[in-house]
Amino acid sequence: MRAVRAETRARELFRDAAFPASDSSLFYNLSTPLAQFREDITWRRPQDICATPQLFPDNPWEGQVKQGLLGDCWFLCACAALQKSRHLLDQVFPPGQPGWSDQEYQGFFTCRIWQFGHWEEVTIDDRLPCLAGRLCFSRCQREDVFWLPLLEKAYAKVHGSYEHLWAGQVADALVDLTGSLAERWSLKDIRKASGQQDRPSGGEHRACQQLLRLKDQCLLSCSVLSPRAGARELGEFHAFIISDLQELRSQTGQGILLLRIHNPWGRRCWQGLWREGGEGWNQVEPAKESELLAQLQEGEFWVEEEEFLREFDEVTIGYPVTEAGHLQSLYTEKVLCHTRALPGAWVTGQSAGGCRNNSCFPCNPKFWLRLLEPSEVCVAVLQRPRRRLVGQTRALAGASPAPVNLPGKDYQAVGLHIWKVEKRKISLPRVLSAPPVAGTACHAYDREIHLRCELSPGYYLAVPSTFLKDVPGQFLLRVFSTGKISLSAVRLATKGASPGAALPAGEWETVQLQGSWRAGQTAGGSRNFASYPCNPCLPFSVPEGAGPRYIRITLQQHCRLSDSQLHPIGFHVFQVPADGEKQDACSLLLQEPLLSCVPHCYAQEVSRLCLLSAGNYRIVPSTYLPDTEGTFTVTIATRIDRQSIHSQEMLGQLLQEVSFMAVMKA
């Protein structure tokens, strides 16, 4: 934020060069209906849209979400969760920022978005997309309130463009805006489990009763995945907000459960029995009808339980977050006040073992989970989306629109299983051949999957997996518990000679090089990632001699996370061509390495003894995952082959010259 203020001093109002007011911020590949408005969209600041812009209104309803031309109802439904808890809104939209009437106003705002385990600050200018002088994407019920379109712009910046927000999951946006967990209940699956296809089952009724209990604590959303005959007004692939639930009695004494649904489109699209003037109201007293209809705001309507279960496909529920930032259980209302998280990865040919149907399932990443007391535990696996190709505006040159990207395209089918073990030293085949104490019902193409269980004290082995083997990916394992826990990765055994193994006898010249991995700068991760060339590239040379020389290269990390956790590290060595002294590091690192010390191992140090010819080389040390910070030392020991000399003064005994450099003996 300090850098932004410095830039604004040289200009009248801040202009965000990283997310400019241009087509590159609006579109990804012109694959959505948004493309037809390309020539008509202009950018305006709030003070150019209305006379007295404000961030938040005094009346909460005036700040309610309303959808525009962009198909991001999933994101807007999640935004409604922020209005239920002021501390959540303050977390995402830090208070105290200068507004349009303040002297300190400089044309920018800062939001916080939760991304892969961390809250990231996202600063934007306040130029917003408009059509005919009005906001064309999200807006609040009162159009001079701007917290929502500004947050939408920040979220679009995180994703790369507004068009990237077309279609998504409410659950994903809820996690990004709260840092918590979200559950998706398939109403169709609940009905299948009960064996009743024609009418609501006991399981569905219990689900609605649970929604009634949770209505004041967390965001409730419902979605239509395909339209039904006679109810096409709900649309297809559209998300709604469940604003309220009311349990009442009919005039004959029967129980009735009504759900108040808010359509982000901002219009009442429901023509069911409980619409205004509908037949359903004949079942209740006129006074009750008037009371409930008076509660409806723009875009809201009442639906009875049976209609709701018939017409909607899915319900999404966000876990409540306390003011202290702890999750609260949806099932017991207990506070999950102990949290741990660790990153991991599935590496093709190494740790991407696939599901339990595959013989290489034991190769998957494994984690130790220790509980110190009986606890309610939620364990989640959050996938990092595969990065889209760089150059997102390539399709803007006049190419025909590409097919709309479908939700889930960027994610693998992922599952999670947990085994109880007696101690940390185990027979892995024996443990994995037994039934797990907890596991996901199936592998799902969701960004995040999780399971909830009651666990007794002791050690547990958690194994996240993709359904298919040799499918690469990164993930974050998150654990939330009512009791004290510890979480650590199972270390991979380092193959080959140990790092501290003795060198062959003789004289060795040693050189030590210091370096560091810095997120966003020099922490590029392994060669599986496009950011690999960002890693430190350390030069060394082998002098001319009678032939190839023995070289021992040792990489030692100084980035221990705890007594039981180390980063996975490794290195590659590249030979510089004789005519390639001026070759840049990036192009050199795109070639095949001459030798490698991989797979990356959870070890304090790793090393490789090799024979190298005279020439120039580059060592590239790396952690497996990008943006993993730490410092390291690379030690290069070169064998010096010196000829023995005879000395008459020593009566024919052999002497060796003593180098001023370090002498290392076996």
Swiss-Prot record:
GO biological-process terms attached to the record: autophagy of mitochondrion; cellular response to insulin stimulus; mitochondrion organization; positive regulation of apoptotic process; positive regulation of D-glucose import; positive regulation of insulin secretion; positive regulation of intracellular transport; positive regulation of type B pancreatic cell apoptotic process
Segments for region (Domain III 2): 507-648
EC number: 3.4.22.-
Keyword set, alphabetical order: Cytoplasm, Hydrolase, Nucleus, Protease, Repeat, Thiol protease
Region listing for Domain III 1, in residue ranges: 322-488
Positions of disulphide bridges: none
Tissue: Ubiquitous.
Cytoplasm in keyword set: yes
Entry-linked CDD domains: Calpain_III, CysPc
UniProt-annotated catalytic positions: C73, H238, N263
Top-tier EC class: hydrolase
Main location: cytoplasm
Location in or out of the cell: Cytoplasm; Nucleus
Alphabetical list of Pfam families matching this protein: Calpain_III, Peptidase_C2
One term under GO cellular component: cytoskeleton
Family classification: Belongs to the peptidase C2 family.
Functional description taken from the UniProt entry: Calcium-regulated non-lysosomal thiol-protease which catalyzes limited proteolysis of substrates involved in cytoskeletal remodeling and signal transduction. May play a role in insulin-stimulated glucose uptake.
Protein name (record): Calpain-10
